[in-house]
Regions:
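Segments that shape or occlude catalytic/ligand-binding pockets
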Residues: 79
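Short, well-ordered surface patches within globular domains
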Residues: 82-83
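Extracytoplasmic cell-surface/polysaccharide-interacting catalytic and binding patches
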Residues: 1-74, 88-181, 187-203
Length: 203
């Protein structure tokens, strides 16, 4: 794994693959398979997180591993200009954070969007991700409906509710907190603190 850029290192960002070696990286914004319908990151984008999240993510992965499960990362550090473009597409702060004068959450590298997967042989095509089968969570990533909220029950199967609870428990073991509005979004320590906007490329 190549080292991160000087800018990333100066900002305290690390590549999640150095923290969770068996993680599956599927950065949706590096493809057109996202709610904007356009590619927002370069194709070789990396999953960067602030070093303060490293221990927690490793702990979460350790909870999943005995079950034959791995963390799947859909988004990590997100540049400010990408956040602006996303809000232009969906200008609703209930679903997309309004860009501001400071970096928080993804823009600070202190939040991640994740699910988990396993090497399950019988897997519906919609949940197939390479050699892995994504857990049934009731919705896809960036689903702008009430079913996507972390503790939703209406329209969410018992299996999906249990899988969400399992993911939350694993992440909580690492001190990471779910955002109630999105089952896939987890915040690390200090995610809500005002910080200078980073000018760090994701590749």
């Amino acid at each position: 794994m190549p080292p991160v850029s000087e800018a990333a290192r100066a900002a305290g960002l690390v590549d999640v693959r150095g923290v969770v070696p068996d993680a599956a990286i599927d950065l949706r914004y590096a493809t057109a398979n996202n709610f904007t319908g356009t590619q927002l990151y370069p194709p070789r984008a990396r999953c960067l997180v602030h070093e303060s999240m490293a221990e927690g993510l490793a702990a979460a992965a350790a909870v999943l591993r005995p079950h034959g499960q791995v963390l799947v990362f859909w988004d990590c550090y997100r540049p400010h200009d990408v956040q602006v473009r996303m809000f232009d597409v969906v200008p609703n702060p209930a679903w997309v954070a309004r860009p501001g004068k400071y970096a928080h959450s993804h823009e600070a590298g202190r939040s991640v969007d994740v699910t988990f997967a396993s090497a399950q042989r019988q897997c519906p095509s919609v949940r197939r991700s390479g050699e892995l089968c994504l857990a049934d969570m009731g919705t896809d990533f960036d689903d702008f409906s009430s079913r996507a909220t972390a503790f939703a029950t209406q329209g969410v199967s018992a299996e999906a509710q249990a899988n969400r609870a399992h993911l939350r428990a694993a992440m909580q073991a690492g001190g990471l907190t779910v955002y109630s509005g999105e089952w896939w979004h987890f915040d690390g320590p200090g995610a809500g603190v005002d910080r200078p906007i980073l000018e760090v490329p994701v590749d």
